[in-house]
Amino acid sequence: MSLLEKINEPAAIKKFTLAELDILAREIRQELVQTVARTGGHLAPNLGVVELTLALHSVFDLPRDKIIWDVGHQCYVHKILTGRRQEMTSLRQFGGLSGFPKRAESPYDAFDTGHSSTSISAALGMALARDLKGEDYQVVAVIGDGALTGGMAFEAMNHAGHLQANLIVVLNDNEMSIAPPVGGLAAYLSRLRTDPMYSRGKEELENLLNRLPHLGPRVLKVIDRLKDSFKYLVVPGMFFEEIGFTYLGPIEGHNIARLKEVLQHARNTRGPVLVHVITTKGKGYQPAEDHPDRFHGIGPFDPATGEPLAGGGPPTYTSVFGAELVRQGEKNNRLVAITAAMPDGTGLTPFARRFPKRFFDVGIAEQHALTLAAGLAAAGMHPVVAIYSTFLQRAIDQVIHDIALMELPVVLAIDRAGLVGEDGETHQGLFDVSLLRCVPGLVLMAPKDEQELRHMLVTALQYQGPAALRYPRGAGMGVPLTGTAQPLPIGKGEVLRRGRDVTILALGPLAYAALEAAGDLAARGIEATVINPRFIKPLDEDLILTWADRTGHLVTVEEHVLAGGFGSAVLELLARNGRKGIRVRCLGVKDEFVHQGKPAILREHLGLTPAGIRAAVQALLAETPVLHRRRNQTKGISGG
């Protein structure tokens, strides 16, 4: 029996020897590789925190003590140790385990995460609640060096240092973003500062010197001055000390004995403590160590080689956007591109290579990214901010206050709009339309395919104000990418198919699902008009009202929440224009969060498939007698 099979609860590992914990770490790595090879997921981050997670579970008493995993994608080892090992085959699958911590899933998950830089704020809140209620437990936030670039993390640390709250922050430094220690002396000083004997010895020395008349206090002052100067020279954690944290580290993050020793010391230290741990992303699996970025988040792969199993197919929307942006950059030397720590994910890497001086990666700082773009635009440049829909949520005030109020020409390229799939509710791009549709002067578009995406990028770049285009994750529709991208007339949709019984307004690539549904309906004697709206704001009001009058029935379809979404915009249009007799059904996401699963499965679950659209049309028409429908259709179907 393997050691891993002996673990029914995390307390079991407290009895393991250090040698057994090292063996357990190897077993966990092997299981991680095999599991993620089947399900896909965040492999490299989890391989890097195996020993750290074992040490945390050895020192702290979960679930009484609380561990909050920043971002949360590095929680797989934690899930294995907390009774979910048998369910790991369902990781990130529909109805299975989430790829992130989830309070509803386990009492061992103290706080839901998915976005970056939130853990320290949450940990501080829990620590304050503990103290106000007179309870006694430890609160630990585990945050990566990348997440520490987020301003929210520093806001929380500043507040924690001011309050001198009892909490522990573990800095998982896996890319050496923070300066490494300087030589053996720094390591020696770090060793002293993590040893409980250091604090006691320092106090005893001070007491001894204070008993010496005249000489003692003077020596202490000299020692303090030397100590302060010395610390800034050789210890890389003095920033944290200055804001009120006790800094412990840097620590070898794959040495379980050392990790346990330091974490125990942190547990016994009053006030906020930062434990700086150096880890290797992808540790123990050579392909992931060689290519940690590629294995940060990966689909199913061959564990023997590390090569992805899936391949081929149409280019992704992201890659088409990136290629077109480079073409536009060749024509316009005022065009600049901005990302918030996602150059590969947003398709900006080719632009960065071609125009390094016109590319800016701001780190995990979405608010700064948007206002940086505003400043660039105000000074005569034309910025494009490529950002995931879910992360744009963090910078809506900047869109309104810093961009739209001044009508600045900033382009928002909103990637991962709609259902993103296996990353689940924290990453679905289902709120951007509601958030942006209300912003005065902003143009909002959604392409039906990758060719139209090219045209919309050019349209956005030619618009003299804020413009946004939202497009999904994954492969395009496979349409030919031909010719030079041309601007589209703003606020004009297109009719893809004409019919007399019902009008289907399908946003983005769902236009193709609507066309398929229309074909199925035609076989059943129902004639449907299918419209690609193209523009969510401004709507093509004439086109929509014309076809609403002709057919008397509208179905809107969108990969977005219904509240405040595209369907809401259509309903508002009808109400403003007194179209009380038009019957409407809106398809989209109701008042719920959408959990993880493959996008195709999620669309089926939500009724956003050809079959779902067909059923919605049939249900809508069933509410109105055929004779009454025909009498109300007083206009022909030509034109429009």
Curated annotation (Swiss-Prot):
CDD domains: TPP_DXS, TPP_PYR_DXS_TK_like. GO terms for molecular function: 1-deoxy-D-xylulose-5-phosphate synthase activity; magnesium ion binding; thiamine pyrophosphate binding. Keywords: Isoprene biosynthesis, Magnesium, Metal-binding, Thiamine biosynthesis, Thiamine pyrophosphate, Transferase. Its cofactor is Mg(2+); thiamine diphosphate. InterPro entries: Dxylulose-5-P_synthase (IPR005477), THDP-binding (IPR029061), Transketo_C/PFOR_II (IPR009014), Transketolase-like_Pyr-bd (IPR005475), Transketolase_BS (IPR020826), Transketolase_C (IPR033248), Transketolase_CS (IPR049557). Pathway: Metabolic intermediate biosynthesis; 1-deoxy-D-xylulose 5-phosphate biosynthesis; 1-deoxy-D-xylulose 5-phosphate from D-glyceraldehyde 3-phosphate and pyruvate: step 1/1. The keyword Metal-binding applies. Homodimer. HAMAP family: DXP_synth. Catalyzes the acyloin condensation reaction between C atoms 2 and 3 of pyruvate and glyceraldehyde 3-phosphate to yield 1-deoxy-D-xylulose-5-phosphate (DXP). This is 1-deoxy-D-xylulose-5-phosphate synthase. It comes from Moorella thermoacetica (strain ATCC 39073 / JCM 9320). The lineage of its organism: Bacteria, Bacillati, Bacillota, Clostridia, Moorellales.
